[in-house]
Structure formats: C-alpha cells, structure tokens
Amino acid sequence: YGVSNVKWLNQIHIQDTRYMGRFMGRDYVTLKKENIGGVERWVENSVTTMNLKSSIVRVTEMGGQHEIQGFVLNDGTSIESVEVKIDDGPWGRAEINPRSTKYSWKLFRYDWNDATPGDHTVVSRVTDVNGNVQVTAEELPDKVSRWENYAQFPRTVRI
C-alpha cells in the first residue's frame, strides 16, 4: 500500500494541513471524548502521534533462569528507561537492546531471578527523556478506537 510514501517523485505539492488520503481518512481515525462548550461530545480525529507504549510479549525459562521480553513503540524521542513490575513488587529497570534505532521497535529484556511457581502478574512501562511515562488503563483518555490503546498492559503468567 504505502499510499503516502514516496516511490517516484514527479511533482511536489505543499499544503498546510495533514494529508488525509484514502486510508488515513477512513482507517486511521479515533473517537475521543472532548468537552466542547460545557458539553461532552465524541469527536473524530486522525491518528497522528505515536504515544509511548511498551508491552511484555513473553517469559522464557532456560536452566531455571527466567527472562521477560517485550517491545517499546514511540515517536522517536529518546527513551530514558523501560521498567518491569512483577506482582505488587517494585519497578525494576529492563535492558533495551542497543541495536534499536530512533524510530524502530525497541526490544527489551529483564532477568527475573527469583521466580516462584504459580500465577504472577507482569507489566512494563516506558519513560522518555522528557519525563513522559506510559499511562495506566485508568489514566488513558476516553477513546473508543483500537488504534490508540497505549496503556500499560498487565499480563498473567504461570511459572
């Protein structure tokens, strides 16, 4: 597809508004609740900015050692930290893969040294250098679109 990606350049058109081609105007929209003149209304907006998002994708075990792995998506702003929380414990700093680039998915890992048998809740959060922290589900603005669910995503794993 790549409807708004340059392939062959025949002419340049400059505009002062966001390009809303066929797919952007139909598929990349979100509804969010806004207060307009004292009345709450659902307003359609185009998806524009990549918000901070991290998610745990798997927990592996090798030789009795457990490792939590995940990814980060962001808008290219440098990442200050990725942290992992297990059950009600403290946040622990994860290691970001050094091969990650500014706009790429950033992979992270966290050594879970004291894993015990049973069900556990694991969650990650990312913070950028400007102090922005990935929101929790409770802090996520009212939206009804699947495109912008960037809240922390707790997962239950069984050891």
Where do the protein language model's features map onto the residues?
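Extended, aromatic/histidine-rich regions of cofactor-dependent oxidoreductases associated
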Residues: 1-159
